Amino acid sequence: MLMTTTTIAMSLSHDVIIAAAQRAARAIPPLWPLASSVAVNPFLGQASEPLEVAAARLRRASGIAVTMPRSWYAERLQSGEITEDDLQAAFQTAPAARRPPNVSALKHAIKVARPAPQAIPTVAELARDVTAIDWPGIVNERIGHWAAGYFDQGQALWAVGQSGGAYSTWRIIATHDLTPEIAGLAGFSQSVSDAPATAEDALVDCVARLGLSPDALDGYFHRLLTTLGGWGQVARYRLWQAELNGGTDACVTDLLAIRMLWEAALLHNGGSALVPGWQSAIAAYAAPVAASSDDVVDSILQEAAERAAQRKLNTVLAAPSSARLSRGRLTLQMAFCIDVRSEVFRRALESLDSGITTLGFAGFFGFGIGHRRFASDVVEARLPVLLSPGVVTCAGEPTPAANAAELSARITARAKRAWGRFKLAAISSFAFVEATGPIYIAKLLRDGLALARHHAPTDPAPRPAHELDLDTRLTMAARILKAMSFTSNFARLVVLAGHGAKVVNNPHASALHCGACGGYSGEVNARLLASLLNDHQVRAGLAERGIVIPADTLFLAALHDTTTDAVTLFADDHPSPTHAQDLAQVTQWLAAAGALARGERALRLPRANRSQDIAHRARDWAEIRPEWALAGCQAFIAAPRSRSAGRDLAGRAFLHDYDWRCDHGFGVLELILTAPVVVASWISLQYYGSTVAPERFGAGNKLLHNVTGGIGVVEGNGGILRTGLPWQSVHDGERLIHEPLRLSVLIEAPTEAIGAILERHPQLRALFDNRWLHLFALDDEGRMARRYIGDLSWETYVGDASSQSNRASTLA
C-alpha cells in the first residue's frame, strides 16, 4: 500500500519547496578541497541560535550531541577546575524558564547521563528496520561511488562528465546501475528514468509522493543533507564560491533531489509496512525545534567550563610580566601570523634579547592575492576564504632566462604527470610493479626510514602579474601598516614571517598551513609585503603620509615551519651587505628560539622524548601526529604586544597587535572583528565540533583514510566523505589534547566602539549574542574588565580574587 498524497502536500507550491531547499543548503557548512583545505565552522548554519537550540536542531538532523558527556564536566567540578562560582554564574545566564530550579538541582543533573541523541528517521532507516537490509548504507555507498567521480579534481583517470549538472549526470548512471535492484529495491532504475528532467521538478514531485507537510520541509531537507556527509558540503562549497563571485550554483539542490528519489522509491517499495512510522516521522519533522531541559543543562555546564578557562586566562594576563624591552632602538622586529602556534615561538624569541620584539597580524599580511606559482597555471587564492582576490601575482621576472627555466620546469612536470598516470592506468598498473619495482628500492628505503630532507621553497620572488601604479602601492602599504598598528619605531631589521608545515603522507597537510592564506603557506604574501616596503618610492610616499621608515631599515620575508620550528629567511630577495652582521645575529637567534620552541612542544607530543625528535616526525610516513596544529586554541587577543609579552599562554591564544589609540574612526578594529576574529572562530569551532561530535564533524581515523577525488577522505573503500579533523588531531591515544571550549575574544578598545561595530554587522553580532564566541574588553593594563552579555550590553568582569602572589604564570 502506498502513502496517500495529502491535500496539504499537493497544495505546496514550487517556490515554497525550493525556498525550503535553499534554507536547508545554508544549514550545512561548506567543505574546501584537500589542496586548499581551511578550517570551517561546522555550526555555520546555526549561528543565529544559541547552543541549546542548535543542540536540539542537530539532534533531530544528525543524531549527535554538541557538548561533552556530563562525566567530563563532573570530573572538572570534582577537581576544582570548575568552581561553584563558575557554575552559579553559568546558571544565571541560562533562560529562567528552562533551567533547573537551582544550582543544587543542576549539580544533581550532572550525575545523570543524558539520553542518547536520536535523529528523526528517514525512509531509508525505516526500511532498514522493516526489511533488515542496510538501506542507509546502500544509499550512501551508491551516491558516494558516483560523487567521487563527479566531483573529482584530477585524481581519477576517467572522470565523470559534468555537463548538465549533478542531477542529470547521476540519472544517466543510475538508470544503468542494477545494484539497488539486486539489493531488493525493485524498479529503481525505471523510477529514476521516469523522474522529472530537472532537480527542482524532482523535488516537487518527491514532496508530493512522500506526503510532506509545509512545516516538515526544512527539517526533513536538512536531515537528508546531513546523511550525505561531506558530499553535501562539497556542493555547499560550490555554492559558497559561486556566491562569492556574484553567481549561484544548484549542486546542493541536485544532491537533495537525488537523495529524495531514493526516499520516494523506498517508500513505494516498502508499502503499508512503512506508513505508520513515516507518518510519525513527518509529524516529528513538522514540530517546532525547541531545546529540552537536558539541552539547557548541557549548555550551562559548557558555559561553566568556559568561565573556568576565562578565569585562568585573566589570572595569567593580570600577573606581572617577565618581558624585558630595550629602551633604545630595537635590533629586530618580527611579525608573525596570529596563529596560536606562533605564540610559543614568539615567546621563545623575545626571551633571548631585550632588543627583540614580535608582532601579530593575519598571516596573509593584508595581501588578498590570487597567486600563480612558478611553472603553473593554477591560480591559488592565498587569502581568507571570506574574501575574493584583489591582485593576481606570479613568481619570477619575465626575463629570457626565467622564461627558459619555466618552460623546462613545465616539461618536467608534464613528464611526471604522464608517468604517474601510466602507473595508475587500468592495464599498465598490473605490470608496473614487476617491471619497475627495483628502481624504487632506494626511494622506498629513504622515505620509509624518514631519511629524506625537506627543502625550503625555491620559487623565484613573487611579483604582481600586472604592474601596480605608485598610488595603489602607497595605499596598500599605508593600509597594511596601519592595520598592523606598526607605523613608527622601526628596527634596523624587520622580518615578516609567514608560516607553513612540511609533512609527508598526510592528506590533510594543507590544513596545517596558514588558514588566512586559504590553506597555503604564507611566504608568498610575506615576500610581496617585504618588496613593497623596501620600495624607495613607496617609502617616500609613506613619509608624506606620516609613516617614516628609516633609510637603514630592511624588510625581509621568512617562512616559519610550524612542524619543526625552523625558520627560512629569504635574504636573497633583498641583498644588503650593510645588514650582513644583523642577519648573522638574527640567524643565531632564530635557531636558538626554534630549539626552545621544539623543547616546549615536545612535552605535549607523544613519543617525542627530545626536541631533536621533532624534525624526524615531520619526515616519517607513519607519523599520524607530526604536530598538534591549533589544538588547544581558546582565546583571541587584540591588544598591544606589551599586554601579553612575557606571559606563558601555552600556545593557546591568537595574538593580534592592535592599538586603539592610533585607530582613528576604528576602521582597523572593524577589520579585526569582521575578518581575523571570524576566521579564528571557524578554527576554534572546527576543533570543538571534531571533539564533541567526531562521528559527524570529525574525519575519523587517519589509519583508515583513503583520498577520493582529490577532494577529501573516506574511511576504508568508500561511503560518505568525512569532514573536519581526524581523531588523532584532537586526541593523543590516551586523552583529549583539545579542550572543547568556545573562543574567548579579548579586545583592548572602548566598549562603545566595539558595540557600534557589532550593530553594523548583524551576523558578527549573532556569534556573540548567541555565545558561539565570548567577548571581553580589556582595560589599559591588559586586564579583562568588561564582559559582553548580549543585546549590545556589557557587565563588569570580576576575575580571580586571589592575590598577585598566588597567581599562576602559565595558561597550560
Swiss-Prot record:
InterPro entries cross-referenced by the UniProt entry: DabA
Any coiled-coil regions, as ranges: none
UniProt keyword Secreted present: no
Protein name, per record: Probable inorganic carbon transporter subunit DabA
Native species: Xanthomonas oryzae pv. oryzae (strain PXO99A)
Assembly with partners or alone: Forms a complex with DabB.
HAMAP family for this protein: DabA
GO molecular function: zinc ion binding
Family membership: Belongs to the inorganic carbon transporter (TC 9.A.2) DabA family.
Superkingdom to which the source organism belongs: Bacteria
Residues binding Zn(2+), per UniProt: C337, D339, H499, C514
Pfam families reported in the protein's UniProt record: DabA (PF10070)
UniProt keyword list: Cell inner membrane, Cell membrane, Membrane, Metal-binding, Transport, Zinc
Main localization, broad class: membrane
Statement: the UniProt record of this protein carries the keyword Metal-binding: yes
Bilayer topology annotation: Peripheral membrane protein
Any Gene Ontology CC annotation: plasma membrane
Cofactor: Zn(2+)
